[in-house]
């Protein structure tokens, strides 16, 4: 229980589970390798084994990309992005032979003479098996960072660029 400034109390709980770390290092390494390979088309060929491309998937959007999308989307289409700065890898959950890993980073892409910056979050759900690690789910969200440059305004409109469809947040 925590006491709040107004005198009220807030109750919370935390889950702490001690378990064998098992193959968590291999799963973290797979997430990092998968992520870095998407930046170079030729390196990404080995990722095709994880793809589950669906004909009903939106084959042109880069705001949200999953294993059901196209290989071209997975490899950033024609955007030509480069990772900038550190990529932050986080083990979000580990339960037996299942792990959820998140990688957060920034990427840049040239648009003519202008450089655009994007915030990227990748989520991996993996299952370890004795033969290999299975990629159960993958989702990459990408949102262009709004700079406020004058060329991003058109009359009464603001041009926001690539987003993941969650709307605008201040």
Outline where the language-model segments fall.
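Surface-exposed, charged secondary-structure patches
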Residues: 69-115
């Amino acid at each position: 229980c925590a006491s709040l400034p107004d005198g009220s109390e807030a109750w919370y709980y935390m889950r702490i589970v001690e378990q064998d770390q098992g193959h968590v290092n291999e799963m973290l390494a797979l997430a990092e390798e998968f992520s870095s390979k998407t930046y170079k088309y030729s390196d990404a060929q080995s990722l095709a084994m994880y793809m589950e491309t669906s004909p009903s998937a939106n084959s042109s959007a880069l705001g949200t990309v999953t294993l059901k999308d196209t290989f071209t989307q997975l490899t950033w289409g024609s955007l030509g992005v480069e990772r900038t700065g550190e990529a932050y890898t986080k083990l979000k959950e580990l339960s037996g032979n299942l792990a959820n890993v998140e990688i957060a980073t920034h990427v840049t892409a040239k648009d003519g003479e202008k450089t655009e910056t994007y915030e990227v979050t990748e989520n991996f759900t993996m299952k370890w098996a004795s033969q290999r690690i299975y990629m159960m789910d993958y989702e990459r969200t990408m949102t262009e960072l709004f700079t406020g440059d004058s060329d991003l305004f058109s009359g009464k409109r603001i041009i926001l660029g690539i987003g993941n469809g969650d709307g605008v947040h201040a």
